[in-house]
Amino acid sequence: NAEYGRAMSGVVNVVTKDGGSKFEGFASLGVSTYSTENTDIFIGLSPDLNRSTDLKFNLGGPIIGDKVTFFTNVRKQTNLGHLNGLRLFNVDDYSNFYYDDPQLWYSEKSGDSSYVPMNTGLGLSALFKLSFNFIKGIRFSTLYSYSDDSWFGYDHGFKYNPDGRSESVKYTRYYAFQLNHMISQKFFYELKYSITDNEYGNYVFKNPFDDRYVHDVFFDSYGPG
């Protein structure tokens, strides 16, 4: 639709409420988990390990009467999923079964054998807005918002090396200034200026030269062993 097209082209119009002359707020916490009798399929599934939470909080009100008001909104989400792996191997472990002689085969297993959630997501978002009404008919506001999201997708090839999966990350920072001038009951204009800063990534370690990376040759299963 048109709104989606504008968002994809970088044209973003963020509309948020202003704080009022009285303090108003809201808070909520949601918690969920998983339970199953099929423990041979969903290994290690437990309420403590695979708990998900959703925390929401907002607050608005006056700073200087109705001349300066604020509004803030925060949300934190944690989803630890329902698919676990078993940490038999660490990321920098490697195995070598390329030799014909079994005496030369090598497998390094330095993991702690603990269960690790493998389809997870973490999200934190926040918004803060200041509104100013010093001059009749003129209102201006400043707004700052950010979101930090990270998630892992389940990969069966890493069931016993769950820390070897790459993590997806997304950071967004948004800054905005808005001026609204009401000239009459039928005529007004708005001026808006905003900056958006986005960062995306997908990696095991952020540094591509991290010496904990194991060469790709040790990832395939080819070899006599």
Predicted regions, residues:
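Surface-exposed strand-loop-strand hairpins of Gram-negative outer-membrane beta-barrel proteins
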Residues: 35-51
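Sequence/structural signature of outer-membrane beta-barrel proteins
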Residues: 32-36, 79-81, 149-151, 198-200
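A beta-strand signature from Gram-negative outer-membrane beta-barrel systems
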Residues: 1-28, 54-56, 64-67
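Transmembrane beta-barrel wall of Gram-negative outer-membrane proteins
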Residues: 48-150, 170-189
